């Protein structure tokens, strides 16, 4: 929470930084457990057995409208307020951090990205990239390339990690 407080403090200290904030998604692997924390609309996905699953939930107005049933998935894709973030670091003193815990299996791929990618590239296409290329550098480059080709209207950040289960060592 220190980073959140520092962003909040700087934004309040300097007038030109008023309204400054950021989203974040963090992934930590401890043994075979994946722990994720997120605020805002940066996302974490798990790719396993040729399937992709979004692990985080966006903190956005459109996500709230989807959850309440006021709009459909199709309407959400082009909603004029789809970029309104309801939670972010640095905007208000109180922030809601969501936590997710997942058991990993050998061969799983962890895919983190900013909204600059997830707003431009469909989950299905992310799945295809992860399935068609085995090297994480190539996967990341292809994902960024796809977002840029789709219009690249925002910063695009991607982090990819492959999980390999440790073999038990007998003593």
Predicted ranges, named:
Residues 1-171:
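PP2C/PPM-type serine/threonine phosphatase catalytic domain
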């Amino acid at each position: 929470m220190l980073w959140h407080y520092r962003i909040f403090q700087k934004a309040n200290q300097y007038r030109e930084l008023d309204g400054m904030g950021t989203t974040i998604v963090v992934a930590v692997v401890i043994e075979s457990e994946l722990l994720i924390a997120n605020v805002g609309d940066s996302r974490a996905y798990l790719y396993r057995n040729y399937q992709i699953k979004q692990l985080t939930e966006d903190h956005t107005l459109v996500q709230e409208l989807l959850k309440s049933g006021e709009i459909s998935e199709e309407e959400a894709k082009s909603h004029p307020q789809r970029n309104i973030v309801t939670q972010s670091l640095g905007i208000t003193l109180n922030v809601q951090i969501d936590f997710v815990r997942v058991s990993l299996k050998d061969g799983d791929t962890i895919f983190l990205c900013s909204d600059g990618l997830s707003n431009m590239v469909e989950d299905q296409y992310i799945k295809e990239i992860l399935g068609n290329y085995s090297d994480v550098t190539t996967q990341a480059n292809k994902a960024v390339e796809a977002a840029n080709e789709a219009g690249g209207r925002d910063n695009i950040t991607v982090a990819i990690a492959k999980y390999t289960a440790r073999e038990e060592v007998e003593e």
